[in-house]
């Protein structure tokens, strides 16, 4: 399993045993044009399962993960998305994901709105986070999924509902070609240090500041 599945492949550089899909070959050409060092980095990393973090106060962390999931499914990969805090509220992407069958599975593992803060944290929410993490750990280590998205897990960690070291330990043990995306504000430094790619979303302005409500089909 992994990213190199396309029937259209190219042999790269002086090593004819390395075979890339058309899209990966294009990326290699771009890297090569930037210089041998960049091309060498591309060849070293092309078969690595990435740890990606989408964090920051701006909008689009889950949306970006969904876009990556769509790209992955289009390349023949299997995707599991576990939403740690989202509950039964209906999101448009749930309907879309169903059309992919077992190639893209999405599960809402929480109750939606979480009350946090010391003794006020609801034990039921903590229990549900524990269940979500148990399923996530099994899914990651099984190697049955090419991409596992841990949506809102950064919130669960920052709310002290989940120990970051437990998450880090599983990330260190993950199968080589399994990709992981972790989303949510306030990504823990331990997770950031382990990640290959970290993007911090920054809010410049938002429609709600003008009193415009979330738009169906765009934001949910």
List PLM regions with ranges.
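Structural recognition of the conserved hydrophobic beta-strand(s) that form the central parallel beta-sheet
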Residues: 150, 179-184
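Phosphate-binding/switch region of NTP-binding enzymes
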Residues: 185-220
């Amino acid at each position: 399993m992994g990213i190199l599945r396309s029937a259209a492949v190219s042999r790269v550089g002086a090593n004819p045993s390395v075979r890339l899909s058309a899209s990966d070959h294009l990326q290699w050409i771009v890297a090569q044009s930037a210089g041998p060092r960049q091309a060498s980095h591309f060849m070293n990393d092309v078969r690595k399962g990435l740890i990606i973090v989408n964090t920051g106060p701006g909008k689009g962390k889950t949306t970006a993960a969904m876009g990556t999931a769509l790209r992955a499914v289009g390349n023949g990969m299997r995707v599991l998305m576990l939403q740690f805090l989202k509950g039964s509220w209906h999101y448009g992407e749930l309907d879309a994901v169903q059309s992919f069958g077992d190639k893209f599975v999405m599960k809402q593992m929480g109750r939606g709105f979480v009350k946090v803060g010391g003794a006020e944290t609801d034990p039921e929410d903590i229990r549900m986070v524990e269940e979500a993490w148990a399923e996530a750990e099994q899914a990651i280590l099984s190697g049955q999924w090419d991409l596992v998205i841990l949506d809102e897990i950064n919130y669960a960690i920052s709310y002290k509902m989940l120990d970051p070291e437990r998450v880090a330990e599983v990330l260190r043990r993950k199968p080589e070609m399994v990709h992981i995306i972790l989303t949510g504000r306030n990504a823990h430094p331990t997770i950031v240090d382990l990640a290959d790619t970290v993007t911090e979303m920054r809010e410049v302005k938002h429609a709600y500041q003008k009193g415009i409500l979330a738009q169906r089909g765009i934001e949910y």
